Swiss-Prot record:
SMART domains from the UniProt entry: ERCC4
Superkingdom assignment: Eukaryota
Main location: nucleus
Signal peptide: none
Organism annotation: Danio rerio
Gene3D superfamilies per record: 3.40.50.10130, Crossover junction endonuclease EME1, DNA-binding domain, DNA polymerase beta, N-terminal domain-like, Winged helix-like DNA-binding domain superfamily/Winged helix DNA-binding domain
Protein's name according to its UniProt entry: Structure-specific endonuclease subunit MUS81
EC number in record: 3.1.22.-
Gene Ontology biological process terms in this record: DNA catabolic process; double-strand break repair via break-induced replication; mitotic intra-S DNA damage checkpoint signaling; resolution of meiotic recombination intermediates
Location of region: Helix-hairpin-helix (2HhH): 524-598
ERCC4 domain sequence ranges: 314-423
CDD domains documented for this protein: WH_MUS81, XPF_nuclease_Mus81
Acidic residues composition bias: residue spans: 253-262
Amino acid sequence: MPTDQVCLGRKRPLPSCPNPLFLQWLTELRDSAKEKGLKTHFVYQKAINSLKKYPLPLKNGKEAKILQNFGDGICKILDERLQKHYRENGSDAAVHLASSKQMEESQKEPSGNFSEHTKLTQKEVRKEKGAKKKREYVPQKRSGGYAVLLTLYRHMQMPGSKGFMFRNELQTEAQPLCEKSFTVPDLGSKYTAWSSVSTLIQKELVVKTHNPARYSLTDQGLSLAEKLDSEETGTRHEDVDSQDGQNVVDLTLEEEDEDEEKESWSSERPAVALPVNQARGLMSESDPMGKSQTSETGRTAMGWHLSPGSYDIVLCVDLCETTGGSSVRKQELVKELQRNSVTFDVRKLNVGDFLWVARERVTPVPGQLRPPVGKELVLDYIIERKRMDDLCGSIIDGRFREQKFRLKRCGLRKPIYLVEECGSAAAHLSIPESTLQQAIVNTQVVDGFFVKRVQDAKESAAYLTIMTRYLQKLYQNCTLLCRSRELEGDGEAESEKMVANLSCSLMAFTEFNYGAIKNKCQTVREVFARQLMQISGVSGDKAAAVLKHYSTVSSLLQAYDKCSSETEKEKLLSSVKYGKLKRNLGPALSRTIYQLYCTRGPLS
């Protein structure tokens, strides 16, 4: 017998896919997207996995919509490919028989002499055996990457999961699983545990999409996260064999990544190691503390929650209310709050001047310089403070309308305007006092804000004190549930109903403050809205009504081009409905907007 002869054993034939053409086309689309560096290749891969599991033949792409991960786009592509296939091969061309022929050819076993294909395959096998095996990338236990993978995986397992998480939400949820801080770097360094997310994206374990960023697991990341989760909770989903006979996960990094990981993690701040008991209710065997620092903090299908008695209601004061301008006047407010024994915290607020948060109570850890960072949920009350001179200035420069619009869009259900009338000071301003009073009334009647009038900073402090006491009593027996900014409720009635039922859904402070950033990266639609609101007479409701019909400047200009006459162009937007009363935008504003975007010379 020749020395190079290979004995071939029996091979169990794999079941053939009944839709080989669809499988072939999806594979081509996936490979093409991967070559171009497009993230859509993950979508095609999911569709391929679903198609392989489906045992029945499909007549067209429309029928494939019943499968998981098949949307309108993929079904339309398959139908187009199928029509092209029929045009090239005739309407009677076989669609479901190719796989059976391929299976017959693949099942034919060579006898005696080996074909060229077999020899080439043997050479490739020897080459692969001789090559050094590349180690699989697995993040170190309780590192930033490890915590992010586990958090995304456990979030996907929850009922009603969106399948993705925002950055602030992900940092908050992943912190108990990580020994390093996701937000505070070590002294003298700029790196945090969040630095490892770029490595996860580079290794194609995590996908970052949209703006604000959404993070989700790829198929490869899902497989790795499932393995890490089974190791963490001590429940194996599959046996992992090793030479020592132990069921372990290989936590060895690739050689090219070892230096990168060491450089990143060596510069991070050591934080408290909290147990992993949120998603499964199980304690980690490797937990160095033995008990949870946040035992009253639980997890629900919507996210984590704060139980009654596990949090404090704290007033948050914007940094601008304590610094700059008239320091004597601003310090007077702080001193009054201290005199009234109000628990408050001065911080940067991206919208509003005062709000309240429910801050989790945490126990200091012996040996740690800083106590663990408690979770915070924002209550549905936010206050914008206005002195008469400030109100006058904001009306002149246009900030007044913009501030009201941003307060409506911030996600909190009960905005309040706190107006300091300051005696007769309004009589000496550049805008008549009657105009200022009318602006205040419009804020209450038209915009639906609650308006509180006071005389000076001392009365403002008294009102803040009363509100703090009221909210402490209102929420003292409530279970507070964390919700995403995108899952805003229906308004004030829902909030009161939930409080009456001793539960309330609130936003995390980090997510709220990040979503209210004024100068963050904006979409074309948002920039268009801001442009419209600079026009005299265009409110937020009117701008939103225009955006419903024309979301960008380009779409509006295209609509103007389709008009047959100048008069028709000027009246294009006049019949657009806005607001609750569904009033028309009117010919005057319609003509002004047309002149702004279509007049080449100076406006008349």
